[in-house]
């Protein structure tokens, strides 16, 4: 299985473990990294059985006000699902802004539309006070940027 996540999530790690939705833990290897500016990474795990996948959406169709869901592991609370809306689309920096709670431990996880399609990869929160609490400004990398990354890594035939 190939896992898409944020490169800062694995930055500096000697060993990388991926835990799936059912609690199984797999050793992962890095297939490709797209630097800190884009903050994307592809990991490879070797499960004994087929993994469920989440379909990619089209981030060009994302609209301000649309409902979104973020999945992550904030502060170690595994499998957390939060909801919100798209607050803004920053075309200059290439980010989707949302008020869905994205806290430490959520980055690298999917931002989903109401159809359950991945429209972004949760990246960070904006917090001018420099504490680690979410103030309602979460940022995600649009999935179309990730699709370009996957194509450039010549792995698109292995992914859905």
Name what the model sees in each region:
Residues 1-72, 76-79, 93-97, 156-159:
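Conserved active-site neighborhood of the chymotrypsin/trypsin-like protease fold
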Residues 7, 40, 62, 68, ...:
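Extracytoplasmic/secreted envelope proteins and their assembly/folding machinery
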Residues 13, 51, 118-160:
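C-terminal cap/linker of serine protease catalytic domains
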Residues 28-31, 86, 111:
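Conserved hydrophobic positions within beta-strands
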Residues 56-63, 76, 80, 106, ...:
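Soluble non-cytosolic domains of exported or imported proteins
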Residues 76-84, 130-131:
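Short, Lys/Arg- and Gly-enriched loop/turn segments at beta-strand edges
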Residues 85-86, 91:
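Short proline/glycine- and basic residue-enriched helix-capping loop/turn segments at helix->loop/beta transitions
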Residues 101-122:
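Catalytic nucleophile loop of clan PA
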């Amino acid at each position: 299985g190939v896992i898409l996540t944020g490169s800062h999530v694995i930055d500096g790690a000697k060993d990388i473990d991926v835990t799936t939705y059912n609690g199984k833990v797999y050793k992962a290897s890095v297939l490709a990294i797209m630097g800190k500016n884009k903050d994307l990474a592809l990991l490879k795990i070797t499960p004994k059985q087929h993994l469920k996948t989440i379909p990619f959406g089209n981030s060009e169709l994302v609209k301000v006000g649309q409902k979104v869901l973020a999945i992550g592991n904030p502060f170690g609370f595994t499998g957390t699902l939060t909801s919100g809306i798209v607050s803004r689309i920053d075309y200059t920096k290439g980010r989707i802004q949302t008020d869905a709670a994205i806290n430490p431990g959520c980055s690298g996880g999917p931002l989903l539309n109401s159809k359950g399609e991945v429209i972004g990869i949760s990246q960070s929160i904006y917090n001018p006070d420099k504490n680690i609490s979410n103030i309602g400004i979460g940022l995600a990398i649009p999935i179309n940027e990730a699709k370009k990354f996957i194509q450039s890594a010549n792995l698109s035939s292995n992914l859905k």
